[in-house]
Curated annotation (Swiss-Prot):
Compartments where located: Cytoplasm
A molecular function GO annotation: GTPase activity
Protein name: Elongation factor G 1
Signal peptide from the UniProt entry: none
InterPro entries in UniProt: EFG_II, EFG_III, EFG_III/V, EFG_IV, EFG_V, EFG_V-like, EFTu-like_2, G_TR_CS
HAMAP family: EF_G_EF_2_B (MF_00054_B)
One Pfam family linked to the record: EFG_III
Residue stretches making up the tr-type G domain: 8-290
Binding site for GTP: 17-24, 88-92, 142-145
GO CC field: cytoplasm
Length: 700
């Protein structure tokens, strides 16, 4: 089968924003204008096409990043047909992992901001992630029809708070109730959309007289930004003082793809104005798969290599999301980076080194699906019938294995015990939790060995609440949930050198003998665990060294202070001895474990607690209350900012253990007028009195 759309006309984009910027509505309008979706779904009624899980519709927030394919020929039908794959990303901070994983497979992003609220805390998180993956982006200022809407204020905030370099390519005509349309600064014409046709028809008219000066000023800034893309354009601009439309678009496109600037547009998705022009900007300024650097990976021999976005290359793809579908079972969303694959082909899951047959391939449109026979470089599709694949796995041609760069998932910071209500729920719960953990790598399930309870861990209270809710709806499991518990960790302050562990049992017959000497050091924050083999002269035979490592790793799970996992330590195995007959793997595993426990005791162990970055938006009158309360929760105030349209943003670092039930007390402190967001920042040493209380509670 030949390719329907040339790869140069593909755009793999994400629509990203904070809650309530109107992202889902914006996506809906995109689907409507691209002709996929003939009746507009509204979030207000809980009927939006992209939000396809029941809880998303109830809560009106987007949780799952669904992928949809749409086609666009320009709002005036003036482009050849382009294929736009849209990955919807959630806006709530507990779902940052979803944003992160979709950023990995995007080529470009459209950041949606509220014209009233401007840049919110979550916008900063998303922006940082887009920077991390070097994702070219556009800014779309939505809700221009709302009271307090101010396009230029958002422009200032993008520069100040995000250190962005926005370049407006349109200027709004009016604002709030008087918002009529936009002036296209490239064409220097006003665009007025026809309300009767829900914005599918529009007219170019002359720029309103009162806006001419403003438009000239902003056009000059835009042309200058385009001219800076290369020397030839700069010289032409300096000589002629002007550039052609094509040169402006080319200059802005090159700089957008290089992540130097962000074209900025505006509109109101709800009132059907502006999204159409934004879609044209996606075609004009965001990259196709061939405009960005080829994906890199490792071959079997560990050599680094790259795969170009071309059908002639060997097949490689990345599984970026797993979903359970009530009709077809497990769906694996994957992005094809190179080559072609057909349904029925055998693939290699290079991450797990397992071969699997690709069953059916589905092209997703929000919650509808169409079966297709093949996918090519640049495509995003869903596979049915892959049993082994999980998020972040590389799928490739078995004859040409490659492992693409893996995604890194954060460690959970909050845990809860969960118990089935009846015996019948017990079995179903295990199945449901495993299925959910497979879908979401930032959600973990384990059994507490002492109490036998099932413990679930995740990125925040809302995260766990939604997963327990899904268990009930999708798997019919009724469960009771315990109080949230903080995921404390243990580490060391000092080093401990030459600590030995000796496991000897000799009581006639075959005995046990293992002897290991280690040095324990603190490694840098977030590094985890590191094992170094420094054995010389075969004092411990090669085959027993992994057993020492294994024994230490088992002991890491439960530290010496209060049984919390140990992090950020480096163990060097320096010496030991063995017995020809009595030594075995188990003896060295025990020796490693004993040496590590003793080394931990000597190395001044400390308790670490998760610190959260908290941002509170509050009217100025309550500022003192909010700050006093945060300080009372052992919070460290990091700074304050003014909000668009009055009010203050207070930024603080607060221990997670002090933040339970915060939303209730914030409501009473501020008469329900303040809001807050919270995300995990890092682990920090717990103060002595706090640590002692936690340790005594745990060791009672």
């Amino acid at each position: 089968m030949a390719r329907k759309t040339p790869i140069e006309r593909y755009r793999n984009i994400g629509i990203s924003a904070h809650i309530d910027a109107g992202k889902t509505t914006t996506t809906e309008r995109i689907l409507f204008y691209t002709g996929v979706n003939h009746k507009i779904g509204e979030v207000h009624d809980g009927a939006a096409t992209m939000d396809w899980m029941e809880q998303e519709q109830e809560r009106g927030i987007t949780i799952t990043s669904a992928a949809t394919t749409a086609f666009w020929k320009g709002m005036g039908g003036n482009y050849p047909e382009h294929r736009i794959n849209i990955i919807d990303t959630p806006g709530h901070v507990d779902f940052t992992i979803e944003v992160e994983r979709s950023m990995r497979v995007l080529d470009g992003a459209c950041m949606v901001y509220c014209a009233v609220g401007g840049v919110q805390p979550q916008s900063e998180t998303v922006w940082r992630q887009a920077n991390k993956y070097k994702v070219p982006r556009l800014a779309f200022v939505n809700k221009m029809d709302r009271t307090g809407a101010n396009f230029f204020k958002v422009y200032d905030q993008l520069r100040l708070r995000l250190k962005a370099n926005p370049v407006p390519v349109v200027v709004p005509i009016g604002a709030e109730e008087g918002f009529k349309g936009v002036v296209d600064l490239i064409k220097m014409k006003a665009i007025i959309w026809d309300e009767a046709s829900q914005g599918t028809k529009f007219d170019y008219v002359d720029i309103p007289a009162e806006l001419v000066d403003t438009c000239n000023e902003w056009r000059e800034k835009m042309v200058e930004a385009a001219a800076e893309s290369n020397e030839d354009l700069m010289n032409k601009y300096l000589e002629a003082g002007e550039l052609s439309e094509a040169e402006i678009v080319k200059g802005l496109r090159d700089r957008t793809i290089a992540c130097e600037i962000q074209p900025m547009l505006c509109g109101t998705a709800f009132k059907n104005k502006g999204v159409q022009r934004m879609l044209d900007a996606v075609i004009d300024f965001l990259p196709s798969p061939v405009d960005i650097p080829p994906v890199t990976g490792e071959l079997e021999n560990g050599e680094k290599t790259e795969r170009r976005a071309s059908d002639d290359e060997k097949f490689s793809a990345l599984a970026f999301k797993i979903m359970t579908d009530p009709f077809v079972g497990q769906l694996i969303f994957f992005r094809v980076y190179s080559g072609v694959v057909n349904s029925g082909d055998t693939l290699l899951n290079a991450t797990k080194d397992k071969k699997e047959r690709l069953g059916r391939i589905l092209q997703m449109h929000a919650n509808q699906r169409e079966e297709i026979k093949e996918v090519r470089a640049g495509d995003i599709a869903a596979a049915v019938g892959l049993k082994e694949a999980t998020t972040g796995d590389t799928l490739c041609d078995p004859a040409h294995p490659i492992v693409l760069e893996r995604m890194i998932f954060p460690e959970p910071v909050i845990s809860q015990a969960v118990e089935p209500k009846t015996k019948a729920d017990q079995e179903k719960m295990g199945l449901a939790l495993n299925r959910l953990a497979q879908e979401d790598p930032s959600f973990r399930v384990q059994t507490d060995e002492e109490s036998g309870q099932t413990i679930i861990s995740g990125m925040g209270e809302l995260h766990l609440e939604i997963l327990v809710d899904r268990m009930k709806r999708e798997f019919g499991v009724e469960a009771t949930v315990g109080k949230p518990q903080v995921a404390y960790r243990e580490t060391i302050r000092k080093s401990a050198a030459d600590v030995e562990g000796k496991f000897v049992k000799q009581s006639g017959g075959r005995g046990q003998y293992g002897h290991a000497v280690i040095t324990l050091e603190r490694s840098e924050l977030g590094k985890g665990y590191e094992f170094v083999d420094a054995i010389k002269g075969g004092v411990i035979p090669r085959e027993y060294i992994p057993s020492v490592d294994k024994g230490i790793q088992e002991t890491l799970k439960s530290g010496v202070l209060a049984g919390f996992p140990v992090v950020d330590v480096k163990v060097t195995l320096t010496f030991g001895s063995y017995h020809d007959v009595d030594s075995n793997e188990n003896a060295f595993r025990m020796a490693g474990s004993m040496a590590f426990k003793e080394a931990m005791r000597r190395a001044d162990p400390v308790l670490l607690e998760p610190m959260m970055a908290v941002e509170v938006e509050t009217p100025e009158d309550f500022m003192g209350n909010v700050m006093g309360d945060l300080s009372g929760r052992r919070g460290i105030i990091q700074g304050m900012d003014d909000m668009v349209g009055g009010g203050k943003i207070v930024r603080a670092e607060v221990p997670l253990s002090e933040m339970f039930g915060y939303s209730t007390s914030l409501r009473s402190l501020t008469q329900g007028r303040a809001t807050y967001t919270m995300e995990f920042k890092h682990y920090a040493e717990a103060p002595k009195n706090v640590a002692e209380a936690i340790i005594s509670a745990k060791t009672k």
